[in-house]
Amino acid sequence: MTATATEHVAATSGATGRIARVIGPVVDVEFPADAIPSIYNALTTEITLNGETKTITFETSQHLGDNLVRAISLQATDGLVRGTSVVDSGAPISVPVGDGVKGHIFNVLGQPLDVTESELDISERWPIHRKAPAFASLEGSTEMLETGIKVIDLLTPYIKGGKIGLFGGAGVGKTVLIQEMITRVARNFGGTSVFAGVGERTREGNDLWVEMEEAGVLKDTALVFGQMDEPPGTRLRVALSALTMAEYFRDVQNQDVLLFIDNIFRFTQAGSEVSTLLGRMPSAVGYQPNLADEMGLLQERITSTKGHSITSMQAIYVPADDYTDPAPATTFAHLDATTELSREIASRGLYPAVDPLTSTSRILDPQYIGKDHYNTAVRVKQILQKNKELQDIIAILGVDELSEEDKIVVSRARRIQQFLSQNTYTAKQFTGVEGSTVSIKDTVEGFTAICDGELDHIAEQAFFNVGGLDDVERQWAKIQEQTK
C-alpha cells in the first residue's frame, strides 16, 4: 500500500519502523501505513559494535511507496542489519543555538566535539531546515568591510552584510586566506562568528581551532565540522547546521554575524553523491539535477535583514581551474564580491595570489567607495591589462623592442604586481615576517603614487611582500645599503 498525504499528517514522533535494506549510507526503512515520516525527518537507531553502543541518525529523503522511506545516514552504517528497529523523531535535525555554542566545536547533529553535552549551557534548539527571511524584511547594504589587505580593499572591496566568494584551484591559498580573514575581520569585528568546515581536512580544522584560540576570537565563535571522512549526508547538511546557529544570533539576539564556509564545492560534491545514491538522473558533468535549487536554498538564507546582517565568506574550490564547471558557476550568481586566486600569480610567489583583472565587487563604484578610490582602481587595472597585452610581444622580441611609453607601462605594472603582495598574519609561521594591515587611505595613496610615476626610481623588489609606502621606503633603504 502506498502512503498518502493524509497518512503523512498522522505520522507522529516515536513511530517505529524496521530497516528493510542497507546500501552503504542509504537505508530503506519500512513504517506502519499510518506513521510514514515526513521528508527531512530525523530517524534514529541504536547498534552495538565491538561492545560499544552508539546511536545512528538518518534523514528521510524519499517516499518509495509500499510504506517504505529512503533515508541517508549521517554516520557510518557499519553494524546495521535488516530488521533493526528505527524510531522517527517527528522533526528535522536540530542544533543548539544561543550563547552556549560560542567557543565550542559541533558536528552536523549539534553534538559538541570538545566537551560533553552536560557541560554546555543550552536552552534552545532550532531545526536546520528553515525558510529564508521574508522579502519585505531584507535590507541591502553598500557599506565597505575594510580588511587591511591592499589587493582586496582596492580592487574587490567586500561588503558588510554581503556574500563573498574566494575562488581557486588546489593549492593556491583559499584556506589560508579564509584563516587570514578570520584573524583580521573577526578580531576587529567584535561580534559573533560562525565557521562551517564542509568536507575539508580534519588537520585544517584543528589548525583553525588553535589559531582562533591564539588570536583570542574563539570565545565569540562557534565551529561546526563535517569533514572529508564523513558520509555525504553529513557534508551536505553541515553548512545548514552552522547557518542555523548564525540565524539565531541575527534574528533573536539582533547581532551582526560573520559566517565562514570552507568549502562550498564540497557542499555541492556531497549533494551530487547523495543525488546518485538516491537514484536521480545526473545532469551536466555528473552533477545533481537540482544543483541550482540546493545552492539557492543555502544562499538565500545567508542574507541581511533590517538592522542586522550575516556577512559570509565562502571558499569555493574550482576543479581543474575550470570556472565554467557547474559547481563554481552556480555559486557566482549569489555573490556580491568574488576574489579569484590565480595559479600563475601563486607560482611567482606573490601572495595573496588574487587575480586583479578577474576579481569583482558590486560596490566597485564611485558612489559607494568614492572617486579617488574608484579612479585609482581603474588606473591600476588599465596598467595591468595593458601589460598583459604586451606579454606576447615581450616573449617574442624582448622588452627592448617596446616603445618608451610601453616600457613605462611594463615597469609600473611590475611594481603594482609586487605591491599587491602583502605579508599576512597567518603566513608568519612560514615566512617569519610579521603581518601588516594597511588602511584604505594608505592603499589608495600608494597605488596612486605608482600610477603617477612618483616611485619609478625605486627598484621593484622593494615593493615585494610589504605593507604601505613606509615599508617600501624601508625596504628600498635596505637594498641600497646592501648594494654599497
Swiss-Prot record:
Membrane topology term: Peripheral membrane protein
Binding site for ATP: 168-175
InterPro entries: AAA+_ATPase, ATP-synt_VA_C, ATP_synth_F1_bsu, ATPase_a/bsu_AS, ATPase_alpha/beta_chains, ATPase_F1/V1/A1_a/bsu_N, ATPase_F1/V1/A1_a/bsu_N_sf, ATPase_F1/V1/A1_a/bsu_nucl-bd
GO molecular function, one term: ATP binding
Gene3D superfamilies: 2.40.10.170, Bovine Mitochondrial F1-atpase, Atp Synthase Beta Chain, Chain D, domain 3, P-loop containing nucleotide triphosphate hydrolases
CDD domains, per database record: ATP-synt_F1_beta_C (cd18110), ATP-synt_F1_beta_N (cd18115), F1-ATPase_beta_CD (cd01133)
EC number: 7.1.2.2
Reaction equation(s) it catalyzes: ATP + H2O + 4 H(+)(in) = ADP + phosphate + 5 H(+)(out)
Keyword terms, alphabetized: ATP synthesis, ATP-binding, Cell membrane, CF(1), Hydrogen ion transport, Ion transport, Membrane, Nucleotide-binding, Translocase, Transport
GO cellular component, one term: plasma membrane
Compartments where found: Cell membrane
The keyword Calcium appears for this protein: no
Transmembrane segments: none
SMART domains for this protein: AAA
Pfam families in alphabetical order: ATP-synt_ab, ATP-synt_ab_N, ATP-synt_VA_C
Known role: Produces ATP from ADP in the presence of a proton gradient across the membrane. The catalytic sites are hosted primarily by the beta subunits.
Family per similarity comment: Belongs to the ATPase alpha/beta chains family.
Quaternary structure annotation from Swiss-Prot or TrEMBL: F-type ATPases have 2 components, CF(1) - the catalytic core - and CF(0) - the membrane proton channel. CF(1) has five subunits: alpha(3), beta(3), gamma(1), delta(1), epsilon(1). CF(0) has three main subunits: a(1), b(2) and c(9-12). The alpha and beta chains form an alternating ring which encloses part of the gamma chain. CF(1) is attached to CF(0) by a central stalk formed by the gamma and epsilon chains, while a peripheral stalk is formed by the delta and b chains.
Annotated protein name in UniProt: ATP synthase subunit beta
Organism, scientific name: Pseudarthrobacter chlorophenolicus (strain ATCC 700700 / DSM 12829 / CIP 107037 / JCM 12360 / KCTC 9906 / NCIMB 13794 / A6) (Arthrobacter chlorophenolicus)
